[in-house]
């Protein structure tokens, strides 16, 4: 070998060694670090949650603005480019509340205090806002009491048809636990009631002992919340509530059908028990209370104040190195009806933990391929307002650039992992859950405990309108995820949802918070870092097939044909399989980019610009809320609405509309197949 060749060989060898020594590790190395115990910090999570829940922080208040500044400071100290996006939105607050019961004509009236008992030593308990319903109608009404169980449509049908009870002119009392409170008020109004009282029944929320001795709701506990049936600022439907924007009048808002037309109040189990003792009559099957009417008479008086209030979304950004114009978005809301230890600030603490771990990764040299955006929303409790206004303002950018939205709301309320998602994310969630230890059983992964709880992994869908994923999934068509440990908790939306409850019952060691940050953050990292976006549309096709089979099994008659729907799903399955083969053979940055665009945009194809009939804001034809329960999730919501209407009217036109809605869904699925294939017809 010549000297020149020997020298060249030595230089090449040294160069390779130098490159191997100082080149960045693979992305998977950073992902392993992210979920390692060395990166997690239980004490930091606890400190952040304690700070956030020190005072009640309803949207539009000084306390919530202070909480926003705290979140922003943590984002900034975690090397996120942070800023606040403010909106001016219409919110309501209570001015006057009164509830008076006259048991019989000769009995002395009983005036309820409408207060939650102050338990424990919380120094800020006096700052808790009086119990009320957001956007409740002001008014003074009186009527005999009628008990309507959970206030569902079927409960009112049973009262009228099976029990002969006339609700017209009555004040309805119904219990929480099955449907969204705004739908309870709406159903009562449509049945003829003049007012509504909603309470937390001991059968659903109580126990032999209660907080602070146990996790259960005290007898004086009251679940507050909004009764608004829309999303976003009621005065700016479809556009953002920026300074100087167009706004609907109060009259136009009422005509929209999204705000209640009769007054309502939330009450405690203790107050409800007094009211229900004055009701006589038949008892509905499976229940314990007579339905009335009366003889007890309720006088309900409520005056609310509507104000244009400033709300603040806190946004933190880590710009992508290779694809800065592709966004992986994580979000949680900050505002709470009271202290908000579970709802929502367990999620806020998780989001902050993720921010702090991402900072540690950046200090080790990690940079995301795609941009990661952390969003802390405001005014969610009033009607998903902060997230909806932001989505409406950024609709076009999100439609063309958002990869996925990962939501965490009530992140921790107890044991047991739960996930909801659009189906192309199912496999990614399962894989992430296989890599994180179960916080309640260190011998198993979250996935092993999850599958062991029901012999299979159950991933629910994001059709309901219960949290901030709604605008992303149901309005724009961005793939989405929502996760939690625990599902439902007794002191929901009461003054007892505080740090003490979390520390004693929800997550004493804050290990569930840490685990949630690991799973959610790992899903985000994979979406942000993997060369090809890890979406699996075969899962989507299988899920749609199940929904189509359920529809077919209804045997609707009236010449309803679902064959076009089934064919479109078969086409989607074929396209998904083709994508899998394409991934294995693809080469070149432009080809990868084009494939990722197809994976990202296929979900958008499942939306329709005209939206659902009578609910045009909801654009997604596959997943949307039930018409009669905003919390309830429906597959093919437009078809479901049409079937319900046809069963009521039983006219040729109404059944033809069912077929039309099936055609609409079929076309949307076919469009998604074409997007996945990258074909022009």
Swiss-Prot record:
The chain crosses the membrane at residues 7-24. InterPro entries: PA_dom_sf, PA_domain, Peptidase_M28, Peptidase_M28B, TFR-like_dimer_dom, TFR-like_dimer_dom_sf. The active site is at 380 (nucleophile). Its cofactor is Zn(2+). Gene3D superfamilies: 3.50.30.30, Transferrin receptor-like, dimerisation domain, Zn peptidases. Its EC number is 3.4.17.21. It is an enzyme of class 3 (hydrolase). Binds 2 Zn(2+) ions per subunit. One of its GO terms (cellular component) is endoplasmic reticulum. GO terms for molecular function: metal ion binding; metallocarboxypeptidase activity. It catalyses: Release of an unsubstituted, C-terminal glutamyl residue, typically from Ac-Asp-Glu or folylpoly-gamma-glutamates. GO terms for biological process: meristem maintenance; proteolysis; regulation of meristem growth. Belongs to the peptidase M28 family. M28B subfamily. This is Probable glutamate carboxypeptidase LAMP1.
